[in-house]
């Protein structure tokens, strides 16, 4: 096994495009990561932002070329980098787009796959990122807007143990990338389920006043994830069963069926979690309604207790001269005693009725 030097045929990159950069100051750090391998050779090269862009190494005969683009928003630079592969301008337009529904498109000599990945921020917000794959006979091009390190582990595994990839075709490499995308969803779904369980435990406690808002956010996150996983399922299904995709045939379809099965597991698990979230919302609303009823019951009891007291005080508050009770020596204490007896009697009555 030999290492390939970082040399290649010169590429005429225009002078104003020789630096990897982003169009905006707050755009992600841009980079191009290259992996070249064949049956007995392996090499990796990195072209990072802010440095002079050297000629991207051209694959030799029999080599598979994987180029991973991160945060490349410069249309001119992207067109120049993809020119040797004959990529259609509509594909480049899709790659530069911020939002694309997961899909697969078959061109003459390559497949174009659009996908989305998600991650939870430290603040608990579910963010998304676009991922694109272009799969040809001897090349795979992958694109990601944000430097989230989606394929970093795969590149590191290749570097530490290149024998695992040597001699493999682009179909196997594409399977590894697609499998990594699906595995990333398992990580997100695990975090999602942890949040569901945390809210479920605090559902009947008063320690969290924003619990309804959190349940609503979980419901919204489930809708977003499902909206992506459903079309992804169709993409994996087409890759696994369509015979006109000449890149994927034979043993590679077995691997793709495995990815399809994993995607189905994700959907089933997500549906179960979503049902649990909907149940939690119903339980929480029922709990709040029951607590409101309890409060209204207490207020009603208090109102009923004071109604006869109000009648008594109203009667003796009338301005009549001939009211004999007003002149009784113990009239005041008798009325207070009567009120107290009414209160005690009503409390005993409500207690026996279990209204308190």
Predicted regions and their residues:
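Hydrophobic alpha-helical transmembrane segments and their immediately adjacent juxtamembrane loops
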Residues: 261-356
């Amino acid at each position: 096994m030999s290492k390939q030097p970082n040399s290649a045929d010169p590429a005429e990159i225009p002078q104003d495009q020789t630096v990897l950069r982003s169009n905006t100051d707050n755009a992600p750090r841009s980079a191009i990561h290259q992996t070249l391998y064949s049956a007995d050779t392996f090499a990796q090269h990195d072209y990072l932002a802010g440095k002079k862009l050297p000629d991207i190494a051209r694959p030799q005969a029999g080599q598979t070329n994987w180029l991973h683009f991160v945060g490349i928003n410069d249309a001119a630079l992207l067109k120049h980098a993809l020119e040797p592969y004959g990529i259609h301008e509509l594909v480049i337009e899709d790659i530069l787009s911020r939002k694309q529904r997961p899909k697969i498109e078959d061109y003459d000599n390559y497949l174009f796959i659009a996908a989305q990945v998600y991650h939870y921020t430290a603040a608990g917000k579910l963010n998304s990122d676009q991922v694109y794959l272009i799969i040809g006979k001897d090349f795979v091009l992958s694109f990601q807007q944000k430097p989230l390190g989606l394929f970093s582990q795969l590149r590191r595994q290749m570097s530490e143990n290149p024998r695992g990839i040597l001699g493999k075709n682009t179909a196997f490499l594409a399977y590894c990338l697609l499998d990594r995308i699906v595995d990333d969803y398992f990580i997100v779904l695990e975090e999602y389920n942890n949040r569901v369980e945390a809210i479920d435990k605090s559902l009947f406690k008063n320690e969290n006043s924003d619990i309804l808002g959190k349940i609503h956010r979980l419901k919204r996150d489930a809708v977003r994830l499902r909206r992506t996983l459903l079309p992804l399922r169709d993409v994996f299904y087409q890759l696994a069963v369509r015979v006109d995709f000449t890149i994927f045939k034979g043993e590679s379809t077995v691997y793709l069926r495995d990815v399809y099965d994993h995607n189905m597991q994700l959907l089933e698990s997500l549906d179960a979690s979503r049902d649990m979230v909907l149940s939690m919302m119903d339980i929480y609303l029922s709990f709040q309604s029951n607590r409101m009823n309890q409060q209204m019951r207490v207020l009603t009891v208090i109102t009923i207790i004071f109604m006869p007291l109000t009648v008594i005080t109203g009667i003796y508050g009338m301005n009549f001269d001939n009211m004999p009770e007003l002149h009784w020596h113990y009239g005041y204490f008798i009325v207070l005693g009567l009120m107290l007896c009414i209160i005690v009697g009503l409390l005993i009555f409500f207690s026996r009725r279990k209204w308190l």
